[in-house]
Amino acid sequence: MAVLLPLAAQPPKHEVRAAWITAVYGLDWPQTRTTSPEGIRKQQAELIEILDRLKAANFNTVLFQTRTRGDVLYKSAIEPYNSILTGKVGGDPGYDPLAFAIAECHKRGMECHAWMVTIPLGNRKHVAALGKESVTKKKRAICVPYKREYFLNPGHPQTKEYLMSLVREVVERYDVDGVHFDYLRYPEHALRFSDSYTYRKYGNGRDLAQWRRDNITEIVRYLYKGVKALKPWVKVSTCPVGKYRDTSRYPSRGWNAFHTVYQDVQGWLGEGIQDQVYPMMYFRGNGFYPFALD
């Protein structure tokens, strides 16, 4: 006797068990700076230890932080190395961290996805430390200062092209299994976000909220199609805000994807421009359960 289940009820053929490896401030990795050959070996050993623990815990996917805020953890012709590697902005660590991470993940039968922070560029101190290597200096037209931080302007047509230039470096040169986009959204409560000029120029009669949602969706679409044109097998994902919008009974308290940061995640999935979504479910009790039901 065969039992037929509706598609929504069928378990996936392959379960994704993923973990982020965070390089910002060395939260997960690295703890050691590569100021010597011994430093290189120790930094690599720290990453191997994390991967061994993930493998032992039956994880099969690693989201390895590859771009932070206008700086990177791979050899790029566009943005400088993150200072967390050597203690110096743009300092060459003596090896390619992304290539090393991919090789070590594959040795353990795990996928390695390049996790790339997209829109935020960091606070004033961080941007100043990057100096002339900062995108705020090289591509000033697509950058916006807001609340003592800098952001790429999602409403500027060149923003998606700039992001794709970084993605192209990664996908063409590395054997990544996926590309994972973080902070692909406007900052929270961005009513005064400095995009009035681009809105007047490109709004085409849409209200501000819809125009901003369309901007984010267009970046998602452009990056997805760009990756698939290079390597169709590379998976494309994002980590959106975990609450799509307010429910009829519970508000999101000012933090939801659709209204607050202009992510139309259901629209992305309906259009087929995401392979995976990792919603940020940082909630408890009534801050989580009613939204999960919805």
Annotate each PLM feature.
Residues 72-87, 120-146, 183-204, 249-256:
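Aromatic- and acidic-residue-enriched segments that line the glycan-binding/catalytic groove
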Residues 11-19, 59-70, 94-144, 180-182, ...:
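Glycine-rich, aromatic-flanked loop segments that form ligand/cofactor-binding clefts
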Residues 26-41, 79-95, 145-164, 204-216, ...:
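The substrate-binding groove and active-site-proximal loops of carbohydrate-active enzymes
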Residues 42-71, 173-178, 267-277:
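Catalytic domains of carbohydrate-active enzymes, especially glycoside hydrolases
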Residues 158-294:
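Active-site neighborhood of glycoside hydrolase catalytic domains
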